[in-house]
Amino acid sequence: MSTSYLCDENRKGENRKVEIQELVPYLYSVLLRGVPSRPVFDSRLKFAVKVPVYPKRPLYTTDTRTHYYLKNCFRILEWEIVSHVGGNELLINRRVIDVNNFFICQDANSGPFCTAWRFTH
């Protein structure tokens, strides 16, 4: 599977959704480390697919470009306040992680927040 289709706006509907769903188990380990640019993001995805990590905790990134890059693929469900556990790990206030929902966390001026995302159709 090619990661180049991750946020390709020319690929709509179910085909695009399936490709993104296949990547969800790997996104956590990739984004937790932070992503400085789209090429690096794509490169890390290609590396991460070799080591599946299901997102048991929120995805975390403070990189704005990554945030908006993913917004092309997902829509925001709601905001969720989280608390720091240690390092980059965050504790989410409720359990809603599955293959169709996951969280991307960013630090806001008023404290860390998580954005819940769901696949677009």
Curated annotation (Swiss-Prot):
This is Uncharacterized protein C569.04.
